[in-house]
Amino acid sequence: MSEAEARPTNFIRQIIDEDLASGKHTTVHTRFPPEPNGYLHIGHAKSICLNFGIAQDYQGQCNLRFDDTNPVKEDIEYVDSIKNDVEWLGFHWSGDIRYSSDYFDQLHAYAVELINKGLAYVDELTPEQIREYRGTLTAPGKNSPFRDRSVEENLALFEKMRTGGFEEGKACLRAKIDMASPFIVMRDPVLYRIKFAEHHQTGNKWCIYPMYDFTHCISDALEGITHSLCTLEFQDNRRLYDWVLDNITIPVHPRQYEFSRLNLEYTVMSKRKLNLLVTDKHVEGWDDPRMPTISGLRRRGYTAASIREFCKRIGVTKQDNTIEMASLESCIREDLNENAPRAMAVIDPVKLVIENYPQGESEMVTMPNHPNKPEMGSREVPFSGEIWIDRADFREEANKQYKRLVMGKEVRLRNAYVIKAERVEKDAEGNITTIFCTYDADTLSKDPADGRKVKGVIHWVSAAHALPIEIRLYDRLFSVPNPGTAEDFLSVINPESLVIKQGYGEPSLKAAVAGKAFQFEREGYFCLDSCYATADKLVFNRTVGLRDTWAKAGE
């Protein structure tokens, strides 16, 4: 398969192919323009993969530009986080990082040009009055009483705005377009508003700040962007994008194209709702492993490759749809099944004593790090006469479908011996505290000599060598597929989205590092937590289970 055939195809790439073939463009230049007022989520990952991926595939350029036009909500913390997320996903921007604030002088000059052309005016309606005058989807708006001021008066008033002569909310600069337009975005939109706030890049140089719709089209043009890619909610805004560029003196006029945003089941993408989850402490922070943020997914154990693969699979279309969470989970499950080394850990432990094993002795058993990848090597795991097994792996009575340890029957310990359950001890409440077994000493990693069949295999950890570990069983944050449509989305938070267990792991887990996943055999995929784990306390996060339990529950 050629490189061109291996590329994903979609309507945007078809447009680019046509533009290059016709000579409209000789190169491709895209941009990713986040506002630094929060953490990026999986929806942003789709845009990152699209913009940077297109630039990569066409040997073009992709800018990282921060749309920093609202100093009240923005912070350098978010700038640093966004840069880190883009690089972690495997991309790098062309040249220096850009900021919309780099262009504040040019943007101001273009605003003055619109005033001089009679296409912008200073309005002194209150924000509430502006909303009232704007009209509705079924009723036209009405002109502001300040709409017909002279060019000279508007220039003087705009300068007064710039020099701090108005209080916040007392004046703004609006485009003069058409208050009867069927598109509300074209009903004399605000171009500049007053904000007395220190900016993280420009300090206190400005007290007027341009609006997004005025800023990003001009920024695209100044940077020579060839294809400006936005999500579908900006489709109507394209009219304003084109109007601004058509009415100022600028040599380049990029085109805006819209694609569907990513909607994912069992979570929310709204920045307001995500912020509420954090501020009301329903989650531990923006990087909580249950959050759809890139930092949360990373901490949970998702790999950059799995997120890129997910974005590739869902594709780019113009139709809004909701993607199943199972699709994202299958991407990380496939990645880790292929690449994660194996280890043994017992999440709900019960003691098992092998009564005929030499007392006080232990031995090392050899285990492959990956059953299908001998190149990943093997490890030595200690075995002794007292081990931990998972409580769910033993029953006093069971039917034939239960292939684990049953009283009076045999099971194999993974890569070790065949054992037989003989008796149990229980506490006053009737809970099993210890299982007593015997073992067949001639079955170390081989079948019994007499030919009897032992079908079940369970995992274990030597009690004398076990590492105490905290295991955080993360699950979907919400209990319904579309929490955003609930009357109160907080009421459908999954109460079992985090269950904390105290278990035991094999000694090799002492070398675990954050960001490197393991398959805990027969349990799922786990990684060391980057926040809570210490040298003295190992804390592992469940990234994803071995199979989709939600699909089974829904059947």
UniProtKB/Swiss-Prot annotation:
GO MF, any single term: glutamine-tRNA ligase activity
EC number: 6.1.1.18
Keywords, ordered alphabetically: Aminoacyl-tRNA synthetase, ATP-binding, Cytoplasm, Ligase, Nucleotide-binding, Protein biosynthesis
Places the protein is found: Cytoplasm
Broad enzyme group: ligase
SUPFAM superfamilies in UniProt: Nucleotidylyl transferase, Ribosomal protein L25-like
Entry keyword Coiled coil: no
Reactions the enzyme catalyzes: tRNA(Gln) + L-glutamine + ATP = L-glutaminyl-tRNA(Gln) + AMP + diphosphate
Locus of motif 'HIGH' region: 34-44
Subunit structure: Monomer.
Cited HAMAP family: Gln_tRNA_synth
Protein name (Swiss-Prot/TrEMBL): Glutamine--tRNA ligase
Organism: Salmonella choleraesuis (strain SC-B67)
